[in-house]
Each structure stands twice: as structure tokens, then as C-alpha cells.
């Protein structure tokens, strides 16, 4: 069986199994969706949002792009956010990065990759902005640190969109969260950047960057100690 036909075979088996487990499953799903969460994640095939959160279809609204970015000129992402906030009345938006992210590594390599370079420029801007946290780290730790910083920056970007600010101003319950998924062990890690208002956004963002600064200093001290022993 060729690869495309295999997908249809997989779909048939799945649909049959779901109907056997619950005869009204697809009818209920067709009637409405009631997700409580919007997931903004990376396009990487190793980070399947529904699977790693153990949620079913209809429970998680998902948008994915390279390196889980929220860019103020990206109308694709912003349209998803607006629909989630204004129509679905989602209460939680999660921005999730992940370890060993190809987008992060590509941005760090700074090679000519064609069209995608325009997208990666946003990651490179973050790198230059926080270069003091990245310069002395090993390449592997530098990528992990940039992944964490990127998550904090994207949560901050999201909180500054007119969509989210308007929701908060009218008293709508809406929380923003920044997480990192570790592809090495399958666990999600809360990065401690969380906001429920414009005020908490500023505080949470500053605190998250400050914590990463402390972590950076500890990593440098460990590296210096190992090199001198």
C-alpha cells in the first residue's frame, strides 16, 4: 500500500473505532465545538498538540507555524486568535515552544534559506535583543535558552494585540501561558510567563526574562568551573 492510501486506511480504522466506542461521537462533534484552549505551537511533526495534552477533537483549538510565533502582521494567526477569543470565548491561550526546534536552529545558523528567512528574522531579532543571555552558552544550551526566550516574547506579543487587549478591557476572562515541550522526555514545562491583564503581562514578562538571566549566569559559572578543573 502506498503512503497516501495508507492515510485513508488509517482514517477508516480510526473512524470505525470511534463509532464503535461511541455511536453518537461524530454527531455530537458535528453539532458544535467547545474548546477551552487555543494552542499556538510549532509546525514540527514531533509536537502533536492533541496527543501530548491527551485531548480529543473539539477540545483544543490549534494554530501552528514555524517556531510558534505571534507576529502582528500575520493575519493568519491573528484571525485564529480573534475567532478563538471573540467567537469561541476561549479562556486560555497557550504558546508552546519545544526543544531541538528546527526554526530556532535555522535562525541561529543565519544562512540563506530563501523565503523562510523573512520569517526567521523575527527570531533573529529576539536573539540580538537578548544576546547577553546567549553569547557564552554552548550551542545546545544556546538553542534551549533562545527557545525559552522566544516563548516569553511571543506571549508578550500576543498580550499586546488589539484582540487580547480589547478582551481584557471588557472584562473577559482570558489567560495567556508560555510553555516548552521537551521532545526528549515528552513533558510540558511551564515557563512561568502567564498573564490575565495588561498589568500582569508586563510583570510576568519581566520576571520570566529575569529568571532566565539567573539561569544563564548559573550555566556560565558551571561551564567556567568545568573548564578550569
Swiss-Prot record:
Binds 1 zinc ion per subunit. Its EC number is 4.2.1.1. GO terms for molecular function: carbonate dehydratase activity; zinc ion binding. It catalyses: hydrogencarbonate + H(+) = CO2 + H2O. One of its GO terms (biological process) is carbon utilization. Transmembrane segments: none annotated. SMART domains: Pro_CA. Pfam families: Pro_CA. It is an enzyme of class 4 (lyase). Its cofactor is Zn(2+). Zn(2+) binds at residues 42, 44, 98, 101. InterPro entries: Carbonic_anhydrase, Carbonic_anhydrase_CS, Carbonic_anhydrase_sf. It comes from the Bacteria. Keywords: Lyase, Metal-binding, Zinc. NCBIfam families: PRK10437.1. Belongs to the beta-class carbonic anhydrase family. This is Carbonic anhydrase 2. It comes from Haemophilus influenzae (strain ATCC 51907 / DSM 11121 / KW20 / Rd).
